[in-house]
């Protein structure tokens, strides 16, 4: 992606992103990540999907933000990606203006933009064919409300987000997307097993204990056909297309560290950076980085071409997004591992950015869709 493609507010947004980058660098020292999210609310960065109409520009701006912040903190950037993919998928899905979902969406976006809201997501299945198998969160209609109960193992931005957006099974069949305030006694957060490694993401388990959600905050989905729900697949595709950005940002930071190492390291009276062997290894890292990034940009273009009701385009964008996730996260991890071999013990020195990234980069391939799900899908779709 060319950095000049920044939409209608290039100067402001580029300045905001640089400021956010510098702020996050400072926060990394104290690890008071709540302060960073408070700062982020004062910018337009979290609300890009509410402020742009062009789908590809929305994608590019969200990706660039996540990529830049990922150079400093994978956990923080991953958490923001959870906010982005839900917001972007809802904001850009081509609802017909005659549908009630269109107007519910407009009200929701205006609320998010006006109140500077952060949203978190949980409970959505992120594979193509398994929409009906998500039984973790259930909802039952009761007059003008739905009563929601169940549990999801992971949710980022727990305690930071103002609202939760999640998908649940309906007791009478089908699925629906729910929008609920997070400050509610019927929502309980508990710590996950990640410990301090993903501290900045505020990832916790979430339990719904008969949470009452008004029907006005619910978008029902048509999941009765074999194709399942377009909106869920579209939402899933946004997630896959964006989730590599934090990891590729971190990989780029590591490549910069390798270049700096080559300039400083002396071998037989010459800089390491002058050796053909070093340049060959460095070139391989950059090839992997740029190749993965190009796949991500292709996923963004596929999202922009989607038309409601077009199964071929839906499948194409889903596959483009999954491929970008698979190769993006794997290439990022490979870059970091190869950099460790090049830099040796200096790479793992305590309190260095390379050591921090080395501990965080492994989470990329583990995020949905996992390798086993991706390979299972493509084994049936040659």
Which sequence ranges carry the predicted segments?
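Structured, charged N-terminal subsegments at the starts of enzyme catalytic cores
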Residues: 2-52
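Amphipathic alpha-helices that form helix-helix packing interfaces
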Residues: 20, 244, 251-254, 258, ...
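C-terminal helix-coil-helix/basic helical segment that borders enzyme active sites and/or dimer interfaces
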Residues: 22-26, 290-326, 340-348
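Glycine-rich flavin
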Residues: 32-151, 156
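A short core secondary-structure module
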Residues: 151-189
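Glycine-rich beta->alpha junctions and the first turn(s) of the following alpha-helix
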Residues: 195-289
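Alpha-helical scaffold segments that form or flank carboxylate-/histidine-based iron centers
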Residues: 238-240, 273-285, 316-327, 355-363
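Glycine-rich phosphate/cofactor-binding loops in nucleotide/flavin-utilizing enzymes
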Residues: 341-382
